[in-house]
Amino acid sequence: MKVPAPYAWNSDFATTYENIDSEHRTLFNGLFALAEFNTLTQLNAAIEVFTLHFHDEQGQMIRSNYVNTKEHTDIHNGFMDVMRGWRSPVPQQDLLAGMAWLANHIPTEDFKYKGKL
């Protein structure tokens, strides 16, 4: 999926799960704020919201016996490894890659669990 401009969640990213969609909005906002201000505080805040969201989403997958939980968790862990490697100020190319990752992850990976959680 194309990276939205301005960088914000929109209905193209709707998973049909209100709590997950709300958290996805927070992820978009976190990366947008990091791109705008690029401070250590914003970097830590972005890492925190991604960590919390991935924990919540993976918990919902486990409770629903979602068949692809491990594969999905591995994808999350890979991105968290990337984010935790970022240093403030985060280079523009890393920010753009992170923004693209999220914009692509939701429709390619998260949409696989629609109707299954």
Curated annotation (Swiss-Prot):
Fe cation 1 binds at residues 24, 53, 57, 110. One of its GO terms (molecular function) is oxygen carrier activity. Pfam families: Hemerythrin (PF01814). Gene3D superfamilies: Hemerythrin-like. The keyword Kinase does not apply. InterPro entries: Haemerythrin, Haemerythrin_Fe_BS, Hemerythrin, Hemerythrin-like, Hemerythrin-like_sf, Hemerythrin_metal-bd. The keyword Metal-binding applies. Fe cation 2 binds at residues 57, 72, 76, 105, 110. Keywords: Iron, Metal-binding, Oxygen transport, Transport. PROSITE patterns: HEMERYTHRINS (PS00550). Hemerythrin is a respiratory protein in blood cells of certain marine worms. The oxygen-binding site in each chain contains two iron atoms. Octamer composed of two types of chains: alpha and beta. NCBIfam families: hemeryth_dom (TIGR02481), Hemerythrin (TIGR00058). Belongs to the hemerythrin family. This is Hemerythrin subunit beta. It comes from Lingula reevii.
